[in-house]
From Swiss-Prot:
UniProt keyword annotations, A-Z: Protein biosynthesis, Transferase
Keyword Amino-acid biosynthesis: no
Annotated SUPFAM superfamilies: FMT C-terminal domain-like (SSF50486), Formyltransferase (SSF53328)
Family: Belongs to the Fmt family.
Protein name, per record: Methionyl-tRNA formyltransferase
GO CC, one annotated term: cytosol
Catalysis performed (reactions): L-methionyl-tRNA(fMet) + (6R)-10-formyltetrahydrofolate = N-formyl-L-methionyl-tRNA(fMet) + (6S)-5,6,7,8-tetrahydrofolate + H(+)
Broad EC category: transferase
Role of this protein: Attaches a formyl group to the free amino group of methionyl-tRNA(fMet). The formyl group appears to play a dual role in the initiator identity of N-formylmethionyl-tRNA by promoting its recognition by IF2 and preventing the misappropriation of this tRNA by the elongation apparatus.
Stored HAMAP family: Formyl_trans
Pfam families xrefs: Formyl_trans_C (PF02911), Formyl_trans_N (PF00551)
Amino acid sequence: MKIFFVSSSSIALEVFKEIVKHYEVVGVLTLPDKPKGRGQKLSQNVIKLEAIAKNIKVFDPLILDDNILNLIRDLNPDLMLVFSYGKIFKKEFLDIFPKGCINVHPSLLPKYRGVSPIQSAILNGDCVSGITIQNMALKMDSGNILVQKNFKIKSCDTSYDISKLVSSLSPNLVLEALEKIGKGFLGIPQKSSEATFCSFFKKESGFVDFNLSAFEIKNRINACNPWPLARARLDYGDIIFHRADFLKIDLYKEKKVGEIVDFDSEKGLFVNTGEGILLLLEVQRPGRRVLDYKSFYNGSRQLIGQVFSSIGGVY
């Protein structure tokens, strides 16, 4: 089976490496190079670099015009495999592939159709999520399910953590799906009545409101790592939050919302909220390295009693 691989994200790298071992990958579609770093030099993503290293034809157009479509047709691909590309395809493009098109989606479809399934699962405090290998349909994330696998989300897991987990679990699931396709399996239709949807995170998604419950705040902090990163303000500047947990206790009701009320070397830095205690576990001052809560506290012993304020904006 000749496979045409489509991705622009490192989350798909392990799948790409595994597929190349078992199938003929005739081409790769990815996004154009992007400026990166202080010098804003154009940088190739890891999928493109890996494809070049394996001498696989790479397409990185701004738009899929007729010329690009014809070049892809000339490769005579049987099937397209898509994992985190970031654009929606027209029927004309999908019709190029006689054995169809499949997609790796990091949620238990039909839950969390859309662009931010990992972040949304964490933001909503889900304890379980998963991976779906689906046939692609014109309607976003609505195709028949070929393979699904669930996994647990721990309370302090971040989107970065879950992305790494998805990256490691996906290769075997894709191989299983391709084997099923080879045997004529058409997949199981989704229950559209159970579909939920998720949208893009914005920079403002990382603004923390300490009037919310500790549970809601820790979910937002963990969901926003690695982007846009949650943050709030102390007297001397912004503090970026990379990881958090929470306690269902209300021992500090007399304290201000957002006030740093305690430090526990085994649990974290305690912050009072609208309900419960937020445990800050990993934090950062802008331009400096990320610190665990112990190092942050040891470097700022006057933290207790200081009060975080929200930066503003809307979620």
